[in-house]
From Swiss-Prot:
Similarity-based family: Belongs to the Ap4A hydrolase family.
GO molecular function: bis(5'-nucleosyl)-tetraphosphatase (symmetrical) activity
Coiled-coil boundaries: none
Function of the protein: Hydrolyzes diadenosine 5',5'''-P1,P4-tetraphosphate to yield ADP.
Domain of life according to the entry: Bacteria
Protein name (database record): Bis(5'-nucleosyl)-tetraphosphatase, symmetrical
Catalytic activity entry: P(1),P(4)-bis(5'-adenosyl) tetraphosphate + H2O = 2 ADP + 2 H(+)
InterPro entries: ApaH, Calcineurin-like_PHP_ApaH, Metallo-depent_PP-like
PANTHER family associated with the record: CYTOCHROME C5, PTHR40942
Keywords, ordered alphabetically: Hydrolase
Assigned EC number: 3.6.1.41
Length: 288
């Protein structure tokens, strides 16, 4: 039995299948962790979601911002933007079971035996792991509650509040939790977010750092796997931080990480998110 983690899929099914073939993934015995952003922008969002649903018993999945956007568009199609590739999912005859499965997924996963956490964007520096798990559960409960789902999905958009306070309530509280776990890149040591800057490590606004670079970060005792930040290209100079979004949908690569051995595998992607031909999977012992 092997456990693998894969970076942002964003509807790029061919590169995912390339990686699974590369490691001889067997859904009967192996496990696949997904860092979120399963859909959107790539060429096969519906097919990707259907494939994941077919092997759902083998998956551990956390939701990304694009997955939450899809759920919001499911309830209000006017949420769709021109750049979205999600309409085919909403209009699919099997949409309901796909959406019901999606809304059951987590925002934060923790494997206690391995000491590894996984979130789409990361864990803000001012939260302990226990706090992060508790706050994530608040959003997860809203997603699974039919009476609260629409209110949450309509209210989750926006950049404010840009900092956590235990006194926050209602949809504002859920929004900032969501932004930390699914949209965060740069923040201050106190957790004030900058959600506009999306480039690499050297582009931090004054007073801000990548969330994982703060020396006082309270989750340092855990290894954290995350995606979301394609501009990093998987490169972080920080022990215990595993960045897996390597920009497949932008013509980069899709990266798979063996959670137990530490080995990386990569399949290169074409500019349209399909598999670059000829397909030449790469095994990387030292991910660079």
């Amino acid at each position: 039995m092997a456990t693998y983690a894969v970076g942002d899929l964003q509807g790029c099914l061919q590169p995912l299948k390339c990686l699974l073939e590369r490691v001889s993934f067997n859904p009967a015995v192996d496990r696949l962790w997904l860092v979120g952003d399963l859909v959107n922008r790539g060429p096969e969002s519906l097919e990707t979601l259907r494939f994941l649903y077919s092997i759902r018993q083998s998956l551990v999945c956390v939701l990304g911002n694009h997955d939450l956007h899809l759920l919001a568009a499911w309830h209000n199609v006017e949420r769709l933007k021109k750049s979205d590739t999600l309409r085919e999912i909403i209009e699919a005859p099997d949409a309901d079971p796909l959406f019901d499965w999606l809304r059951q997924q987590k925002l934060l996963h923790y494997d206690e035996a391995r000491g590894i956490a996984m979130a789409h964007a990361g864990i803000p520096p001012q939260w302990t792991l226990g706090q992060a798990l508790g706050y994530a559960a608040e959003v997860e409960e809203a997603l699974r509650d039919d009476s609260r789902l629409k209110l949450y999905l309509d209210g989750m958009y926006g950049n404010e509040p840009n900092k956590w306070s235990k006194n926050l309530t209602g949809v504002e509280r859920l929004r900032v939790i969501t932004n930390y776990l699914t949209r965060m890149r740069f923040c201050t040591a106190e957790g004030k977010l900058d959600l506009k800057s999306k480039e690499g490590l050297g582009t931090a606004p004054k007073g801000y750092k990548p969330w994982f670079a703060h020396k006082g970060r309270r989750s340092r005792h855990v290894t954290i796997i995350f995606g979301h930040w394609a501009a990093l290209e998987g490169r972080v100079d920080e022990p215990g931080i595993i960045a897996l979004d390597t920009g497949c949908v932008w013509g980069g690569a899709m990266t798979l990480y063996n959670v137990d051995s530490g080995e990386y595998h990569r399949c290169d992607c074409a500019d349209d998110g399909t598999l670059r031909q000829p397909a030449q999977p790469t095994t990387l012992n030292d991910h660079t």
